[in-house]
């Protein structure tokens, strides 16, 4: 194994601390026969445990060794994988080196562990190659990554030669990209002593636009702007504003489920992180994806100045915002920044003779969102339609008049008519029906 790993060139930066790197070192020690057997076994078990932990996090199954090697290929960001992500299969000398590396990986895929297992009296590798994972709820592992790793792993295992292996890997890079950005739909920002990083959000909401009852014109505006963005045409930053509980956030979250396979990714950012926006944009501006930077429930009080960071990023900075980035925000306020009568009064505004400029600065933020979509509370008839549609989806077998009568009681006690209120009511009703059936 150590001789195979030493031949890696483009993928040779796995690091000595990687599982594959550690195992290669142990195999080299084993051939030297100077290291005590129990030390070698302990070293192997340490790496097998790491592999099992990784398999648990990503829901690997059947052949964990091949799953792990596939995961390495899918996440290793090197000059070849990053360029292939952008332009697809390359036609150049670099292919020679890539195919050589893939020949190594194909040999590792089918590596015979029986000799070392017999010599050390272990069977851990055989067990890893025929593994049956315990069922886990999808919220406990990264299902999206798991499905892609296992699907590609099976194809690579069946590849008859390095040429086919090469085509399968490059096709994956072109379709899904490379690294955690390629594998995951959504991310949050994490700031630390070593800078700003993106942390995958493993369990995203499964909502689709069709799940949001009503608001057809609003969804169509959002869909049209997003599809133009994905097609490389001109598109605008979008502000979804209006009443609480009307589906603004759900509409934006649905986009990554609708368009993930077309290269859409989402980065969620909070108000206190706006100063990190420039760093985040620098990280993703050259990647072959379209990123929506999502700001939920956006608003500012009069003494908050974070909106200045946002304005600089949206428009007006020295560096032009990359074409692969848009900002989508939701807010209960159309103007985003709280405006007081003090802003309009000459004498009460610290003698600011240019008070209209001060006012304009505050109001200009919402104007920088080229698409502004209003989500207002439904009327009574629309609320009834939402309730009955959700009840049908839930499979509730109650008469319509009973459902609507209970819905009216519920909304009077829970904040009025809205899509959120309707969903909360249906959740409650479904729970009581389950208790009754039991």
Regions found by a protein language model. Give the residues of each.
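Intrinsically disordered, low-complexity N-terminal extensions of AAA+/P-loop NTPases
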Residues: 1-157
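C-terminal alpha-helical "lid" subdomain
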Residues: 372, 376-438
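Interdomain "pre-motor" coupling segment immediately N-terminal to P-loop NTPase/helicase cores
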Residues: 135-198
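Walker A/P-loop nucleotide-binding motif
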Residues: 233-252
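Conserved catalytic/switch belt of AAA+ P-loop NTPases
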Residues: 302-351
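N-terminal pre-Walker A segment at the start of P-loop NTPase domains
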Residues: 199-227
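Conserved AAA+ ATPase "SRH/arginine-finger" region at the nucleotide-binding site
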Residues: 348-363, 370-382
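AAA+/P-loop NTPase substrate/partner-engagement loops
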Residues: 258-291, 299-303
């Amino acid at each position: 194994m150590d001789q195979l790993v030493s031949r890696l060139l483009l993928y040779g930066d796995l690091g000595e601390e990687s599982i594959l790197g550690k195992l290669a070192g142990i195999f080299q020690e084993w051939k030297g026969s100077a290291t005590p057997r129990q030390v070698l076994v302990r070293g192997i078990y340490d790496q097998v445990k790491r592999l099992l932990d990784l398999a648990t996090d990503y829901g690997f199954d059947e052949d964990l060794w091949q799953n792990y090697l596939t995961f390495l290929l899918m996440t290793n960001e090197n000059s070849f994988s990053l360029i292939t992500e952008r332009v697809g299969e390359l036609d150049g000398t670099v292919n020679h080196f890539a195919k050589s590396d893939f020949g190594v990986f194909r040999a590792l895929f089918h590596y015979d562990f029986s000799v070392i297992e017999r010599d050390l009296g272990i069977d851990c590798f055989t067990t890893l190659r025929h593994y049956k994972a315990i069922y886990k709820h999808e919220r406990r592992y990264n299902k999206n990554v798991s499905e892609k790793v296992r699907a590609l792993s099976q194809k690579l295992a069946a590849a008859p030669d390095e040429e086919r292996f090469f085509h399968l890997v490059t096709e994956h890079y072109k379709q899904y990209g490379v690294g955690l950005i390629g594998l995951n739909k959504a991310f949050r920002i994490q700031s630390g002593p070593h800078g700003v990083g993106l942390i995958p959000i493993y369990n995203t909401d499964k909502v689709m636009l069709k799940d949001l009852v009503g608001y057809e014109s609003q969804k169509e505006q959002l869909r049209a702007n997003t599809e133009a963005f994905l097609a490389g045409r001109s598109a605008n930053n979008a502000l979804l504003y209006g009443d609480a509980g009307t589906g603004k956030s759900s509409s934006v979250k649905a986009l990554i489920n609708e368009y993930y396979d077309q290269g859409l990714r989402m980065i969620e950012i909070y108000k206190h992180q706006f100063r990190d926006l420039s760093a985040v944009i620098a990280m993703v501006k050259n990647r072959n994806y379209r990123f929506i930077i999502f700001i939920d429930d956006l608003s500012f009080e009069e003494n908050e100045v974070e909106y200045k960071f946002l304005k600089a990023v949206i428009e007006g900075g020295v560096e032009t915002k990359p074409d692969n980035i848009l900002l989508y925000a939701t807010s209960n306020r159309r103007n985003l920044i709280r405006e007081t009568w003090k802003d309009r009064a000459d004498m009460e505004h610290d003698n600011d003779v240019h008070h209209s400029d001060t006012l304009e600065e505050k109001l200009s933020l919402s104007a920088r969102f080229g698409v502004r979509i209003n989500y207002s509370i439904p009327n009574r008839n629309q609320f009834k339609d939402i309730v009955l549609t959700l009840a049908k989806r839930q499979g509730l077998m109650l008469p319509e008049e009973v459902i609507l009568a209970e819905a009216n009681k519920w909304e009077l006690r829970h904040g009025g008519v809205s899509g959120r209120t309707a969903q909360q009511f249906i959740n409650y009703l479904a729970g009581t029906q389950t208790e009754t059936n039991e």
